[in-house]
Curated annotation (Swiss-Prot):
Compositionally biased spans, kind Polar residues: 64-73
Gene from which the chain derives: GRXS1
PANTHER family: GLUTAREDOXIN FAMILY MEMBER, MONOTHIOL GLUTAREDOXIN-S1, MITOCHONDRIAL
Pfam families, sorted: Glutaredoxin
Primary role: May only reduce GSH-thiol disulfides, but not protein disulfides.
Alphabetized UniProt keyword annotations: 2Fe-2S, Iron, Iron-sulfur, Metal-binding, Mitochondrion, Redox-active center, Transit peptide
Sites where the protein binds [2Fe-2S] cluster: C102
Disulfide bonds listed in the record: none
Family: Belongs to the glutaredoxin family. CGFS subfamily.
Cell compartment(s), UniProt: Mitochondrion
Residue ranges constituting the Glutaredoxin domain according to the UniProt record: 77-179
Disordered: annotated segments: 34-73
Transit peptide: 1-36
Protein known as: Monothiol glutaredoxin-S1, mitochondrial
Species whose genome carries this gene: Oryza sativa subsp. japonica (Rice)
Length: 185
């Protein structure tokens, strides 16, 4: 593959030195490269194929490897409402608490971990519909979005400010106590 691209580049450079027009790589070589390399054919997900793949259930295939349906009766609004209701500290963030994918999400997790509270999180990068639903629910355009005791608090800047002013300790105090009691039992 590298040889194909290299040869095409060299041919294009040689031609361009002879002709007044500039052409680095011939169109057929680019097309061959795109067909060979996944993710370069215009598919932003990196799969190289913009159409979905459907696999028919094969009776010879083990049940664990047969296709499954991902449909659910819950809407994204229901999922967000349930998340907020069931989790005392919830972050909608880029990545996960163990591996944040942006500095603001990392900062929010770092500040909340200072209080030894259980942190629940959802990665908004995994589902853009969920991301848009959360933004509509809070009317807040950026992430992370942090909920404490069912109330939207804000982003990492607000959590940091509350921490620096000593307000976060008051808000998270009873959650930390419940968490300690649960662990000691």
């Amino acid at each position: 593959m590298a040889r194909l691209v290299s040869t095409a580049l060299m041919r294009g450079l040689v031609r361009s030195s002879r002709a007044p027009r500039v052409a680095a790589v011939s169109q057929p070589a680019i097309q061959q490269f795109r067909n060979y390399s996944p993710g370069l054919g215009g598919d932003s997900r990196g799969s190289g194929d913009s159409s979905s793949t459907r696999v028919a259930a094969d009776p010879d295939t083990h049940q664990d490897f047969q296709p499954t349906s991902k449909s659910s009766n819950m809407s994204f609004d229901d999922i967000v409402a349930q998340d907020i209701k069931e989790n005392p500290v919830l972050i909608y963030m880029k990545g996960f608490p163990e591996s944040p994918m942006c500095g603001f999400s990392a900062l929010a997790v770092k500040v909340l971990k200072l209080y030894d509270v259980p942190i629940s999180a959802r990665d908004i990068l995994g589902d853009l519909k969920l991301k848009e639903c959360v933004k509509a629910h809070t009317n807040w355009p950026t992430f992370p979005q942090i909920f404490i005791k069912g109330e939207f608090v804000g982003g990492s800047d607000i959590i940091l400010d509350m921490h620096q002013k000593g307000q976060l300790k008051d808000v998270l105090g009873d959650i930390a106590q419940k968490h300690e009691q649960k662990e000691s039992s």
